């Protein structure tokens, strides 16, 4: 099909829930993608921080292809070798003991909150309150929607799930004012992504940990976007040393294949009993092959340390743009290869300018250019992205 036909057919049948660019993607290799008209782009968005190893990484392609030829799906009523292998590497990467596999970040967060609710109610029937942060994003299922701190996502659905409280991100006094013994969990992103790439202080996270301990509330870190070496550590909580009670993951853990879940320490392993939670597709052999290949490749290629190094280089280059355009760039922040460049005006024209110059970036929170490239991006490709941003800023 040609571009026009593909777009028309998609628009005819797909629910109109996405604001799409008029592009048809066809091929990816490394950090580059091509549309069906042959145009090549440097991708600094990675499918929203998903394609950890870039496109068509040979180890990942081989693992998925070989597993597809053996066993694509198997009920969790039975054991598989590839799931056992995937569980071990996820436990090692997260620093946790027990894993539950799901299919998307919202599912992982939903399961984490469900476990926290059961934990709380087992202590007291009124211990079910969950506190999360303004400007957060945790998913679009009904409970994750209630935990998400954006009014935009709440409008038009009537009453949201009860028992959720929102407080300003980074404000320990606001959190303390809401904390009591009826709180079963505090759910936070260790770095806010959708809210504008906001990095909290270590002190704030340490104080949150202390409040949770004081009130016997579980600390849940949503690492859907920050996890899997994205910030220059296996998981972002490792920067502060503040370990959560529940850690959720998704996006980059499958290298492009849909996988998600949550991880807990041994002391929470038996909050759920058989039948309390589950899922038909979570932890299927194909997904587990992707997880195992992705995590072992990140380790063997030393990508955690490389991300920290390249992220510092990238951030410094963005700061040079801030110095060059002080009236247009108001802040540069982030960690590793999760970076945000805040601009004085709307961010959308900058994204569109970059796209016209064959570079893919994203705008979040209205005026923050979000940069979350594949972990394998080279310095030469970083320079291409920075040059496109420079050109966009000069023109706006």
Show which residues each predicted segment covers.
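Conserved N-terminal phosphate-binding loop of PLP-dependent enzymes in the Aspartate aminotransferase
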Residues: 1-396
């Amino acid at each position: 099909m040609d571009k026009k036909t593909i777009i028309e057919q998609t628009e005819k049948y797909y629910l109109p829930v996405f604001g799409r660019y008029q592009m048809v993607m066809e091929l990816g290799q490394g950090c580059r993608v091509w549309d069906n008209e042959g145009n090549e782009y440097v991708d600094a968005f990675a499918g929203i921080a998903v394609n950890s190893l870039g496109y068509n990484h040979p180890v990942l392609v081989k693992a998925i292809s070989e597993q597809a030829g053996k066993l694509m799906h198997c009920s969790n009523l039975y054991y598989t070798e590839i799931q056992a292998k995937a569980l071990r590497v996820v436990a090692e990467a997260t620093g946790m003991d027990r894993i539950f596999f799901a299919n998307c970040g919202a599912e992982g967060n939903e399961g984490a909150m469900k476990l926290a609710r059961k934990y709380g109610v087992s202590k007291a029937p009124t211990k079910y309150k969950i506190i999360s942060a303004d400007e957060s994003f945790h998913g679009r299922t009904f409970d994750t929607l209630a935990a998400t701190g954006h009014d935009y996502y709440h409008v038009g659905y009537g009453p949201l799930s009860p028992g959720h409280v929102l407080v300003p991100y980074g404000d320990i006094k606001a959190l303390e004012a809401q904390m009591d013994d009826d709180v079963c969990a505090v759910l936070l992103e260790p770095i806010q992504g959708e809210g504008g790439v906001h990095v909290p202080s270590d002190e704030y996270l340490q104080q949150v940990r202390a409040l949770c301990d004081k009130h016997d509330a579980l600390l849940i870190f949503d690492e859907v976007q920050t996890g899997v070496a994205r910030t220059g550590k296996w998981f972002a909580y490792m920067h502060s040393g503040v370990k959560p009670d529940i850690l959720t993951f998704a996006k980059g853990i499958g290298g492009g294949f849909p996988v998600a879940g949550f991880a807990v320490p041994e002391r929470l392993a038996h909050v759920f009993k058989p039948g309390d939670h589950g899922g038909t597709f979570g932890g299927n052999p194909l997904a587990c092959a992707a997880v195992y290949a992705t995590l072992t490749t990140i380790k063997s290629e030393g990508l955690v340390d490389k991300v920290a190094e390249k992220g510092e280089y990238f951030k410094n280059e963005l700061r040079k743009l801030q110095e060059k355009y002080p009236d247009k760039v108001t802040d540069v922040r982030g960690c590793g290869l999760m970076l945000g460049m805040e601009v004085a005006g709307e961010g959308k024209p900058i994204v569109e300018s970059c796209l016209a110059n064959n570079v893919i970036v994203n705008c979040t929170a209205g005026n923050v250019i979000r940069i979350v490239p594949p972990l394998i991006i080279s310095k030469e490709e970083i320079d291409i992205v920075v040059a496109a941003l420079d050109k966009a800023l000069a023109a706006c």
